[in-house]
Amino acid sequence: LLSEAGDLTPAYFEVRKIIEENFGKLPELTVKNSPKKAYGTLELTERCSVFDAAKMLAKPVHSAAPQFMEDIGQYYGYTLYSTVVDGPRDEAEIKFDAVHDRAVVFIDGEYKGFYERTRDGEPVSFSLKKGENCRIDILCENMGRVNYGPKIMDRKGVKSVRFNLQYHFGWDMYPMPLDDISALEYKEQTGEVKTASFLRGYLDIDDEPCDTFLRLDGFTKGIVLVNGFNI
């Protein structure tokens, strides 16, 4: 009955007509469809990597094992789990006892794969020679909660990380609910973006603001904030 923009569609008026034919006249509408406008291409000229952002937005919580978001005082948004692994280490797959809801894995800042709660992801394996080490970062996203049924007490985040069958201990966790990102410090963006990042651009509107739509060609997964508000 309503479009994606909340506009009244022909189907709405047909349903309204049928209701009036059977139950009498309805009150007159006082709403109108909103004006729309195309504002062209928005250049994202500034960037802050998620690894830098975590240190700007959160105080790290250290724990032997990864904790759920609720256990570190967080309820929405993202948590970055970070650890350093020393070699030597034979080829090992990163595994989780629980992923709620999407975990993206980076090794030394480079994207390697993702895990999801409800579908197959891209499992990640790694190996280290003697004297080598690497930093493993896991960016976990809370993708929403249900408010009914057996999963109503749903916890978010990751729990118990293993390399094959061996549990790994010693983690720093950075809670990022993203309700306030004003502390972020951006740098000029040059070249291709190769890791998870906050990107910023500016849209100047001289006349009365209109509704518009975002088309995110080339992007994969993320969120959009307008003047700091997560839409």
Where are these predicted regions, by residue range?
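Edge strands and adjacent loops of beta-rich recognition modules
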Residues: 48-82, 175-201
